């Protein structure tokens, strides 16, 4: 008698990117190719009306009446949906009450949290919107891990962590050997554990492994609200001020104070896009003594005031945080 495939549902919101979906789908397809008993059938369901995103159309059909067909269900989005429709919310809560395993990929954690279905659970939250998520959903145990599997809830922070979570699923269902085989099939160097960090090591971000530079930047990142002076940083890392300035100039092409200012401004921009805090609150949180001081520094670096930037960028994606500083001569 032929075994019935395990149907894994992917409930998609319009802003889902092809990468997020294809990582999950290909892991299941590779498992089926490599293991005759790894019978997975992806089922793509649309949470909202179809929409084209970046030249592609989401696969799938309307979710209505089909959630209960899934042995596991993942909510998938790459931008936080504004709200969950009452009918869909009711269906998801009923599914959760039935004991079904429900997960979320990338910003799919937002609708799951909005419904209270992550309260008291650990959830992996992408570092870009971690501040916003923790502010909005204090009952969720938000982590900065790649993925979390907490009882009947599975969450991946996004990006390649989606594949990491699916490999963990394969390992639980069919053993580590299959997960390893799928990893090799997809040319993945190694299988990462869920509790590994999301961000690459600081030395890779800086392009240098100079120990004094790394120590100084870590100090800056840990002291955003109450910035240290260059002399204080130099003292902490046991070099003279002139030595510290030479190191920064050599590796980062700027003096420590300029790098520190840019670090604080980028943190401020991230908070502007991802939290509902006032502009004054954000400025103070990032070490600026007054609103005018913050606004002036922000405009000099980004070319717009904090208010203008928040209004413009929230017209697009709430999670776009790549900065475009003003050209300097």
From Swiss-Prot:
GO terms under cellular component: protein-DNA complex
User: What Gene3D superfamilies does UniProt report for this protein, alphabetically?
Assistant: 3.40.50.880, Homeodomain-like
**Where does this protein have compositionally biased stretches of type Polar residues?**
319-329
InterPro entries in UniProt:
Class_I_gatase-like (IPR029062), Homeodomain-like_sf (IPR009057), HTH_AraC (IPR018060), HTH_AraC-typ_CS (IPR018062), Tscrpt_reg_AraC-type_HTH (IPR020449)
Which parts of the sequence belong to the HTH araC/xylS-type domain? 214-312
- Please list where the region (Disordered) is annotated: 307-329
Alphabetically ordered keywords of this record: Activator, DNA-binding, Transcription, Transcription regulation
Lineage, top-rank taxon, reads Bacteria
**Segments of the chain annotated as binding DNA:** 231-252, 279-302
**GO terms classed as biological process:** positive regulation of DNA-templated transcription; regulation of arginine biosynthetic process; regulation of arginine catabolic process; regulation of DNA-templated transcription
Per UniProt, what is one GO molecular function of this protein? Answer: transcription cis-regulatory region binding
What's one Pfam family the UniProt record gives for this protein?
HTH_18
Described by its record, this protein's role is as follows:
ArgR could be a transcriptional activator of the dauBAR operon in response to the presence of L-Arg.
Name under which the protein is recorded: HTH-type transcriptional regulator ArgR
Organism of origin: Pseudomonas aeruginosa (strain ATCC 15692 / DSM 22644 / CIP 104116 / JCM 14847 / LMG 12228 / 1C / PRS 101 / PAO1)
Q: Which gene encodes it?
A: argR
């Amino acid at each position: 008698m032929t075994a019935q495939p395990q149907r894994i549902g992917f409930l998609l919101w319009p802003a889902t990117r092809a990468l997020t979906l294809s990582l999950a789908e290909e892991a299941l397809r590779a498992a089926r190719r490599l293991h005759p008993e790894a019978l997975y059938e992806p089922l793509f369901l649309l949470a909202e009306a179809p929409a084209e995103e970046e030249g592609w159309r989401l696969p799938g059909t309307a979710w209505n009446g089909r959630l209960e067909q899934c042995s596991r269900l993942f909510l998938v989005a790459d931008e936080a949906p504004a709200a969950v429709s009452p009918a869909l919310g009711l269906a998801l809560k009923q599914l959760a009450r039935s004991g079904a395993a429900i997960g979320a990929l990338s910003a799919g954690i937002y609708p799951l949290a909005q419904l209270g279905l992550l309260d008291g659970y650990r959830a992996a939250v992408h570092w870009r919107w971690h501040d916003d998520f923790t502010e909005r959903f204090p009952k969720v145990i938000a982590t900065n891990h790649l993925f979390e599997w907490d009882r009947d809830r599975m969450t991946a922070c996004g990006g390649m962590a989606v594949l990491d979570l699916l490999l963990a699923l394969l390992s639980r269902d069919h053993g580590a050997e299959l997960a390893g085989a799928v990893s090799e099939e997809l040319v993945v160097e190694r299988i990462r554990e869920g509790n590994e960090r999301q961000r690459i090591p600081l030395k890779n971000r800086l392009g240098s492994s100079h120990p004094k530079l790394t120590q100084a930047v870590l100090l800056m990142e840990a002291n955003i609200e109450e910035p240290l002076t260059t002399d204080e940083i130099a003292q902490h890392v046991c070099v003279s001020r002139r030595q510290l300035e030479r190191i920064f100039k050599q590796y980062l092409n700027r003096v420590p104070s300029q790098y520190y200012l840019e670090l604080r401004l980028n943190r401020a921009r991230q908070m502007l896009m991802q939290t509902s805090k006032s502009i004054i609150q954000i400025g103070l949180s990032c070490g600026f003594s007054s609103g005018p001081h913050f606004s002036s520094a922000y405009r000099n670096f980004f070319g717009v005031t904090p208010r203008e930037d928040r209004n413009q960028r929230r017209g697009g994606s709430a999670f776009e945080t790549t900065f475009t500083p003003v050209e300097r001569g």
